[in-house]
Amino acid sequence: MSDSSQIRIMIVEDHFVVREGLKAIINSQKDMLTVAEAGNGRQAVEAFEQHQPDVTLMDVRIPGLNGIDAIGSIVAKFPNAHVIVLSTYGGDENIFRAFQAGAMAYFLKDIKGQDLVDAIRAVHAGQRVVPPEIAAQLAGRVPLTALSPREMEILTLVAKGKSNKEIGAKLAISEGTVRVHASNLLSKLHCSGRAQAVSEAIRRGIIEVE
């Protein structure tokens, strides 16, 4: 099969071993070829512009510009981009935001090799692919009242174990203001306490904690 008839694929993944594994699966297919790789979101956007692959495999949690924002940047410039998300994380907000950004498929990284290459072919043909476990997450999604940037900052700091005093000092606001924002975000997440809010936010992919 000639190169012109192969599906040209870009892999965006910050873990070398995972990237090499994906490349081996792809390059074992006669109708597929890896044409570009990237280890972070900014590299992904630049590599897409340079190579304009037929299908992109995109991790969500990558350094710098995250995968979802990278998808948004790519699709904004190339509306016909075909992106498949491969992620360790299946939180409903992650999934929702990925599709909202322009992804055509979302899979967890435990996907079998044959299922992956089948999905690549389907997405290349213009089909959206939503496996049952991902569809179930979307179906059960509770719409999130958007957290403000300040609430997101506070939630992330709470997740890191910071006290109201420490949060206030870091953000240059009073402890009282921290408490008000914390109360608001608890209400939006439908949680009764901070520990529950952090657990829920991580589970749903609203925040990331290193």
Segments from the language model and where they lie:
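Acidic, metal-coordinating helix/loop segments flanking the phosphotransfer/catalytic sites
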Residues: 37-55
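Recognition helix of helix-turn-helix DNA-binding domains
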Residues: 163-196
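Short, conserved "switch-loop" micro-motifs in signal-transduction and mechanochemical regulators
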Residues: 89-90, 176
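Short amphipathic alpha-helix used as the core "switch/output" element in two-component signaling
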Residues: 46, 68-80
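Active-site residues of response regulator receiver
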Residues: 59, 87
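Conserved acidic carboxylate
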Residues: 13
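Acidic catalytic/metal-coordinating carboxylates
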Residues: 40-43, 63-69
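Short, flexible helix-to-coil linker/hinge segments that flank and couple to helix-turn-helix
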Residues: 93-100, 104-153, 206
